[in-house]
């Protein structure tokens, strides 16, 4: 099956798994997805993730979701830049998510970074998603 938006699919899997209170969800593996998950882990939104090879050339990401007192840490997770409408932002024009309580994940020349890391590195890029 061909997906037009693989990253959006992974974000939807995370959103659905957290609403169902699952401890783990799985998604097909890719470098971009792994980079986004690494940024979410650095910001404390997930416990961790691991790549599992199903067979030669086919891998999946096992994502460990995070809960605090039974409530999901991720309240909202939305795709911003989509295949049909890419959204780019200079670092000075990047708005804060919920007045700094949430983060944006950006694809920059220095890799996939959260908005906090991008501001520290003074680089802009494509706004992949927002997390709160």
Curated annotation (Swiss-Prot):
One of its GO terms (molecular function) is structural constituent of ribosome. InterPro entries: Ribosomal_uS8, Ribosomal_uS8_CS, Ribosomal_uS8_sf. GO terms for biological process: translation. One of its GO terms (cellular component) is ribosome. It comes from the Bacteria. SUPFAM superfamilies: Ribosomal protein S8. Keywords: Ribonucleoprotein, Ribosomal protein, RNA-binding, rRNA-binding. One of the primary rRNA binding proteins, it binds directly to 16S rRNA central domain where it helps coordinate assembly of the platform of the 30S subunit. PANTHER family: 40S RIBOSOMAL PROTEIN S15A (PTHR11758). Belongs to the universal ribosomal protein uS8 family. Part of the 30S ribosomal subunit. Contacts proteins S5 and S12. This is Small ribosomal subunit protein uS8. It comes from Gluconobacter oxydans (strain 621H) (Gluconobacter suboxydans).
